[in-house]
């Protein structure tokens, strides 16, 4: 290989130079244009879609159909396009038709009140009503102190309750609340203790009662007065809030339950409600917002107060001081947590915006209210606002009214002659309305097309009849004495006639055969130092070894002596030479021992025995 053909050294090579601008321009020119689908005609642009009212959700649904880009100039055949081709040719027309169909649905058709089922709780008014979030059960409480659990899966056409409970003895049930998973039922009554029940209706915990002699509400561990309302956090199944006449709202957590005391020993947070003069006011109702960011309370002075969840709860974040002229009976958030409904004793229903607490958005007057538990609320999608009215006399019926949330115009009404309607629940999953009345009955409204499960499975379930009294049974005569085993066999005298004696004798014989005499088996031999609590030999355990060393081996010689006097006298010489106690003290002062012979001569000269000094008679 010559020098001309030899490879060049690295030092002689030149670095390559890249033109970034040219490369970027070439990349842009070669990149595929994906702004518009190639199978959509050019006449339909993005601007036309926005003008026609196509929502972002519709565009996102089309983008979910993943397919490669088609080559330019490609046209689909009419047979291949199918029904989707008409959609591509005129999206504006299809969207307009869908919009018109939505507008055609009236608000009345959104209320599931085509059918009705009637359930009896008792003879007293319904004071509490709540459906669990899964929609399998619901609970009702009344002025008769009872809580009744209704299970849709177990009920038939009789509409009978599943369980009847008396959780608070002689206290009125004020409020009920189910946990988001339906495992726990919280009962608020006329006492200061909140009861927690499981699915079977058994109480597994309760809250501690506070000290009513302590003024500071932060120091007391629990409520000191009647609990008016309880509500679970929609985002936390272990947290719930309660309000009481002691002027406080308290946050509790199920994780604080103590197994030993079977009690929640202390609250997590305390929220104080104060009036315009700074004094304590009693909250009557409390609730969480659906997104869990707000806690609201309605007080007996007519004020609506709300706090942001997780704050210090010192200052109120939302306050309407004169929301109503009387006590507030119910408050409810809208599904978007931006509006608030309030119902008061001033016979009004008001809607508030969380952005503007000065003036209500809408006001509805003339709604009779005679119960402190009259509910109000939104439908699951906020198309309707509902509330109940009371019946002041037999001529004026109580009603369940539905209003337009934009104007508060009455769109639907259900009358109850001479009966008040105050407890109302609209379950979002079942799409059924449950109303509690003042006569102790519960009315469930549903629609066969819009509603699902719930009471619909009960109205079609046949009623089971009690047939115990209709069964014809064959009577049997039992005469055991006629059997051969009880016949007399060679007995003489009265034994032939005493039949009871023969029965007892036979039973004793059978009993002895069935129960043989118990014999304790012999112990198995021990292989080792110990087994089954037994020691093989003395000294096999630490206790035996110590006892042997301290007691037996040390006193072996002493135990051998049978003559006690001789064993003591053998130490006499040593004690005389080396005294330890008394003799050592008298060695110098009294070297010669002098013993007392007698104190006083006895009167009886014949008695030569000496008597103790303390027994000698006194001499004159």
Swiss-Prot record:
PROSITE patterns: WD_REPEATS_2, WD_REPEATS_REGION. GO terms for cellular component: nucleus; site of double-strand break. Residues 43-59 have a biased composition (Low complexity). Residues 28-99, 593-620 are annotated as: Disordered. Residues 75-87 have a biased composition (Polar residues). WD repeats lie at residues 121-160, 168-207, 222-262, 278-317, 323-362, 415-455. InterPro entries: WD40/YVTN_repeat-like_dom_sf, WD40_repeat_dom_sf, WD40_rpt, WD_repeat_GAD-1. Keywords: Developmental protein, Repeat, WD repeat. Residues 600-610 have a biased composition (Acidic residues). Disulfide bonds: none annotated. Pfam families: WD40. Gene3D superfamilies: YVTN repeat-like/Quinoprotein amine dehydrogenase (2.130.10.10). Belongs to the WD repeat GAD-1 family. This is Gastrulation defective protein 1. The gene is gad-1.
